[in-house]
Amino acid sequence: MENHLSSQIRTLSYEENEDHPVFGTLVEQILHLLNSRLVFSDVIIHQNSPLMLRQPKGLVAVTDSPITREELEEFFEVIEPNWSERIAERAFDRSIDLHTARIRANCFTFQGKKRLGCVIRRFPKEPLALAGLGLHADEQAFAKFGSGLVLIIGDTCQGKSTTIASMIDDINMHRSGHIITIEDPVETLIPQRKCIITQREVGIDGDVDSFYLGALDALRERPDVIVIGEIRDAQTAQEALALAESGPLVLASLHARSTEMGLQKMIRLLGNSDAQSQALAHALRGVLCQALLPSSQGNRYHLATECLTVSPALMALLEAGDIAGIRARMNGGRDLGCHTMNASLERLLAGHKISVEDARAATTDRVGFADLV
């Protein structure tokens, strides 16, 4: 294994990287990486530095050859003709198709606008099969709900968008209706099967200015299913709840580390009132919290999940704002369709699929995890 000359970041060996082209445009190099056998979640590009990959066990440099400003400018021109105006204001996101792959690129300046940079995340061109994600049957059943609110939560970059796309496509294959997604940006493209698919993009050049306005519009567009790509503020949380109360199924993503933290965040965004807690309790159908962990061999990711399917007993606890009581019931395994993150981590540890250190970092209950190990 080689080490990058100017840092302690490892450089891929020739055997690991035999398919990577020595010459070619930056777009061609990125395409080769996207179609290679290498396992990674992101490509990180800094002007005057080598291409970097985020692999399950950390960062690696693809080669020792630095990427020039001219190469980055050429790539930016491909994904956004007005990139120089956009980047002068702030970083910008673009999702595009590159032949066999679909990517989201976040482009930015740094070091006082002296250098250019870009982080690329790849997505499947079509949704992955829901049954192939590693979700439990109880979690897959969320796609069968006809109404109410389902929250998909977790830290950033934990596969929430992939899960939602797979749930939407599962609905798309099994029943007829109108599915509206509000995304920033549109990531995986959903093909039309039994449903009409309306994928709306948030942003300056998009279809709508904000998640809130997209959700507000959706109510008048006769949806059967609505996806809110991220609940970021109180207005969007309130509109998501109002939509769920009005009849459609609402799938929404929320940044939170555990089920109880996600519920607490929703209650806070809704105004911390008893009336809103009661409304949330009656509209909520389930919560899926997920984390991606590197395998012990470092050659893939494993999905660990925490699942809450709302029962009458759990609804009563949520109405009362008793989040600690919800955690206690989940820990006790007293409700069908519920399991803790620790239960999922325990199965992965028993199969020697992940390390104890990575499991400890992913747990939503450190005290309970200590009893496992």
Feature names for model-found ranges:
Residues 2-373:
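Short, flexible helix-loop junctions that flank or precede catalytic/ligand sites
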